[in-house]
């Protein structure tokens, strides 16, 4: 490694425990305090105490034993985020079986591929629609025996099956599960190709859980610690956060409806939140649009500029001038407190991950009073590998390695990670395992840098690196993240490999575009095709592109862009399940437009 940094461990972490031990320890430590909260069918919040949740998991695990689920058997869950998902996951893993998560948005063909690759024997579907998806490919899944529907009382049925299983039989099964045993196979297709199953062990999860709580103790421990989780539990990061809450003092709130997320924030009042950058961009955009284009809009613009100025002064350690203090106090009363109220009024920190965080957005929220702590991780690292600390965080970096994690840079600048949390390997793909994990170092595929204090900066994606016809190396991520902060832009894909200049394909968000047009006091559009033709919308995209170009050199800047009237979706193959653009698929899909409109030969 050209450069290497290891974060020391303040307290030894026992990676030989199983995942269920985290639940047991919390139930012993704080048995009567709320652990998992959720909305019932009437919209009221209900809670399981730690002891109640532990007992629920045991009851479900007994049902699985009664139905013949054996150690090493794969059991799948296809459901939105819910307490049932979390409890089933724990029950499956507690008896040495493997949880195989499937996104609700996965196609029947993808379900069949995942079920066959992992040899799923039992599946839990949230509702009729998910059950029908499974049934449509059941004849192609030779190992699948049972399918249960959660909405039809599957968990009650499972508990009934388990009444004849003794406590001793459950604990005998649980004691056999060790840190080296597999806990789950998580399928991720990334932004390129077919799904790959990533094998994560109990030790992976336990190690990264306590590495996280020891790295960020002021978020994990203390009074009134609450997290409202609304990411899909099929995502490894969401499952990690469940364990992080259990290992600390955190009450976990679960929400599965983004349409009610703002009211959920207000009711649950989280002390911290976890979200992808797009959520924070949308909150900023909504606040800007609500202010409008008149006097209120000008006041908001000045308040936003003051927040960023405050954040820069804080980060640079230069102190705050009297003028800045006065303006900040004024805008705090007028605007900042309202924005903080969006997150429930008690939120102290927000953790951002999953995609690059635009610096302007990070500085805005930091100046408002909500530090956005950017982190970095992969499914292969059992979610987080590094995160900014609550004290001394540095905007523009993805923070420090978690305790016990080593980071290094390869000769080509590729970021590599070594820790007890690095995955066992790629299921049924030993050749990928051997090429991606070398001497314990996971090769992430991302380009980065490590400063003398151990803070890591991501500079691009190795496989996404664009080399123009003139030989200029361009990392598209910074340009794409900046363009996507525009209220009208949904996705941006920068192109230009082996081409004479850099260009971009931009898609629009129709609802956000109309909200923005209304805030400007102009007529809304009926569809994306009309939006593409709208000169006001075009001017806004052009402004966003110009702002992105200010961040890079002339040779790296976007010279041309095309706004397309087609949304990027999973259905048309242009988005992954985690809402990231599939770069090559976008290039192939819009190949004719790219060849004839962007890079048309001279004379045509």
Please identify what each model-predicted range represents.
Residues 42, 129-179, 287-336:
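ANL superfamily adenylate-forming
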Residues 36-90, 107-112, 159-163, 202-203:
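Conserved AMP-binding/adenylate-forming core of the ANL superfamily
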Residues 206-229, 233-336, 346:
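Conserved AMP-binding/adenylation subdomain of ANL enzymes
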Residues 67, 94-160, 540:
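Structural core segment of the AMP-binding/adenylate-forming
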Residues 401-468, 485:
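Conserved ATP-binding/catalytic segment of the ANL
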Residues 73, 106-136, 208-228, 258-272, ...:
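Conserved ATP-dependent adenylate/AMP-binding module captured primarily in the ANL superfamily
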Residues 47-51, 183-209:
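Conserved AMP-binding A3 loop
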Residues 31-34, 149, 163-187, 194, ...:
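Conserved pre-ATP/AMP-binding loop-to-beta segment of ANL
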